[in-house]
Amino acid sequence: VDVVVANAGILRDAPFHRMTPEQWNEVIATNLTGVFNTIHPVWPGMRERKFGRVIVISSINGQKGQFGQVNYAATKAGDLGIVKSLAQEGARNGITANAVCPGYIATEMIASMPEKALEAVIGQIPAGRVGEPDEIARCVAFLASDDAEFINGSTISANGAQFFVCLLYTSDAA
């Protein structure tokens, strides 16, 4: 395996004071431990061959946090820590490790959002739309290519300029 893409992600949203240990643990197990379990088996071969590309799909919410997503944001921030550490460990062995932090992308996860919530999100994306999966795929393809051989420990933020916009909820969730 020359290129590995770790793309684990589930949501179990709840405000922190209502979050259950089960919600916390399920998200940690999938989003963080899943990344470890995806990369760890192929890492020795990359080291032996002195070549490898590790790409982790994190999230805008791992960069900025998000109301009701303490568990998800923690895992996606943890993914960035994994990338930065692996970049340092792998650099002398020809291995790069980078992340892509998508904003809201037209996936099943986003399609399951209530319509009003999605409208509010789109209203806060300066590009005026959610991203498309192929836009993230092109970021991954670039990071896997020879054109990115000196890019290591970096993050591509693909979010339509949404980076530090906060979504405010007006429900009784708080």
Regions found by a protein language model. Name each.
Residues 44, 88-89, 149:
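Alpha-helical segment proximal to the catalytic Tyr-Lys
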Residues 125-136:
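A conserved structural motif in NAD(P)-dependent oxidoreductases
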Residues 59:
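Residue(s) in the substrate-gating loop at a strand-loop-helix junction
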Residues 169-174:
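Conserved small/polar residues in nucleotide/adenosyl-binding loops
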Residues 39, 75, 83:
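Active-site helix of classical SDR
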Residues 15-16, 23-28, 110, 121:
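Substrate-binding pocket helix/loop in short-chain dehydrogenase/reductase
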Residues 91, 96, 151-153:
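Short, small/polar-rich loop/turn modules that mediate ligand/substrate recognition or access, typified
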